[in-house]
Design a protein with these regions (language model features):
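Feature for exported/extracytoplasmic and membrane-associated proteins, marking the mature portion
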Residues: 1-335, 368
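Active-site lining segments that contact anionic ligands and/or coordinate catalytic metals
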Residues: 295-297, 339-341, 347, 364-367
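Short glycine/threonine-rich loop-to-helix capping motif typified by GTGT followed
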Residues: 309-314, 350-366
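Metal-dependent active-site segment of extracytoplasmic phospho-/sulfohydrolases and closely related
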Residues: 326, 333-358
C-alpha cells in the first residue's frame, strides 16, 4: 500500500505505566514477527492554535504576489525573502517562509508536498450560499476546540467518538500481531485522532519515555499494590478497572523492553520539546519489529499558533523549530532505512484571515498543510 492510499483509507487511551517485573515472553515472541519492509506509519503533527499558513506558502509570481501583498498588508512577507519552490501551479510560482529551508529542500527533491486551502467541509459552498444559510457548515466553525475535533475525526457534520487514525488501525486488525496498544502511540497524551472503536492509544513522554508508577521502587508499596491487584472479591467495576490497569502495566513493560533496544541515532536533534518528540517517534519506529506492529500512527502537538498579534515575530521564532524538527526526523528515518515507509503530515485548527487585524490575523477556515 503506497503512502497516499494509506492516508486516504484511514478516513480511549491507556495510562503510561511500567512495573519492574519480567516482560511476558509470549508478548515478546509475537512482537518479533513483523518484517521491516512491510512497515508503514503515519505521523500526525497538530499545530494547535490555528497556524497562519498563508505566510508559510506564498505566491512568488509578480501578479499573484501583488494580490497577496495587497490583502495581507502589514503581514506580508518580502517577495525577495521567499525560498523558491521548483515548478508552478496554474502558471503561478510559489515560495516558502524564509525559516523553512529544510522543507524547501525536501519539496524540491520530490519528498514533500503542500495541500492548499484545505479544511473541514460538509458540502461545496460559496460565500453567497453561506450568507443565505443555504448550506450545511462544519460544526463549530472558527472554534478552536470544535475544529480540532473536526480535523481529528474527519467528520465535519457530526460529533464522532473515533478519529481517522484510530479507524485506520481498526481497519487493519491483521497487520499488528504484537502489542495492541502499540498501533497508536501519542507523544502528547489523549487525542481524538487515535481513538478507535476497537483500539486505543498509548501515551509516551518524549523525554522520559515510559513512565513508571510512582512508588514502585518501594518494596512495601509494591507488595501492597500487587495484593490489591490479586483481590478476587472485587466488584465488577473494580475488576474491569484492575484489568485495564494490569494491561497498561504489561504494556509498559513491553514498551520499556523495546525502547531499550532502540537504535542509537547519529542524526542530531535540537533539544526543544518538538524535536525531542520527533526523535522519540523515530526511536519507536526503529523498534516496530520488537513491538510486533507493521502499521502505526503517531501523534504529537506543537502548540502556540494562535497569533492574533505579532504574527511575523512569533512565526520567525516558531517556524525554525517546526522546520528543524521535521527535517531532523526525516534524516533519522533515512538513517533507519524507513524514509519511504513513514508519512508525516500537519493539521491545524483552521487557517487564518488573509487580512490583518492591525496586529496579527484572526480565525479563518481553510489553510495550507
Amino acid at each position: 500500500m503506497n503512502r497516499r492510499r494509506f492516508l486516504r483509507n484511514g478516513l480511549g487511551s491507556a495510562v503510561s505505566m511500567t512495573m519492574a517485573t519480567t516482560v511476558p515472553c509470549s508478548l515478546l515472541r509475537s512482537a518479533r514477527a513483523v518484517a521491516s519492509e512491510e512497515y508503514r506509519a503515519v505521523v500526525c503533527v497538530l499545530l494547535a492554535g490555528g497556524a497562519d499558513s498563508f505566510n508559510i506558502l506564498v505566491p512568488r509570481s509578480e501578479l499573484a504576489y501583488n494580490r497577496y501583498q495587497a490583502r495581507r498588508s502589514d503581514l506580508a512577507l518580502s517577495q525577495n525573502d521567499l525560498l523558491p519552490l521548483e515548478g508552478e501551479h496554474e502558471g503561478v510560482q510559489f515560495g516558502l517562509h524564509p525559516a523553512m529551508s529544510s522543507l524547501q529542500q525536501r519539496f524540491n527533491a520530490g519528498q514533500a508536498t503542500m495541500v492548499t486551502n484545505v479544511g473541514p467541509l460538509v458540502e461545496p459552498t460559496t460565500r453567497a450560499a453561506i450568507d443565505a444559510e443555504a448550506v450545511t457548515l462544519p460544526l463549530g466553525l472558527f472554534s478552536h476546540s470544535d475544529q480540532i475535533l473536526r480535523w481529528q475525526t474527519a467528520t465535519p457534520a457530526n460529533r464522532a467518538g473515533t478519529g481517522f487514525g484510530g479507524r485506520l488501525i481498526d481497519a487493519l486488525p491483521g497487520a499488528n500481531t504484537g502489542l495492541a496498544l502499540a498501533g497508536n502511540i501519542s507523544l502528547s497524551g489523549n487525542n481524538s485522532f487515535q481513538a478507535g472503536a476497537a483500539t486505543g492509544s498509548y501515551a509516551i513522554s518524549a523525554n522520559r519515555g515510559v513512565q513508571s508508577i510512582s512508588g514502585f521502587d518501594n518494596d512495601l508499596f509494591k507488595r501492597s499494590f500487587e495484593s490489591l491487584m490479586a483481590d478476587s472479591s472485587a466488584s465488577t467495576l473494580q475488576t474491569v478497572y484492575r484489568n485495564k490497569l494490569q494491561s497498561a502495566i504489561d504494556a509498559g513493560d513491553v514498551f520499556s523492553s523495546a525502547l531499550s533496544q532502540a537504535t542509537t541515532l547519529s542524526t542530531p536533534f535540537a533539544e526543544d520539546s518538538f524535536s525531542s518528540a520527533m526523535k522519540r517517534i523515530a526511536e519507536l519506529a526503529s523498534v516496530h519489529e520488537q513491538l510486533g506492529v507493521s502499521r502505526q500512527t503517531f501523534f504529537v502537538t506543537f502548540g502556540g499558533w494562535d497569533h492574533h498579534e505579532d504574527t511575523l515575530g512569533q512565526q520567525a521564532t516558531m517556524l525554525p523549530a517546526l522546520d528543524a524538527g521535521l527535517g531532523q526526523f526525516q534524516l533519522a528515518l533515512e538513517e533507519l532505512g524507513l524514509s519511504n515507509q513513514v508519512t508525516t503530515f500537519t493539521i491545524s485548527d483552521f487557517g487564518r484571515t488573509l487580512t490583518s487585524n492591525g496586529r496579527g490575523s484572526d480565525h479563518g477556515w481553510g489553510g495550507n498543510a
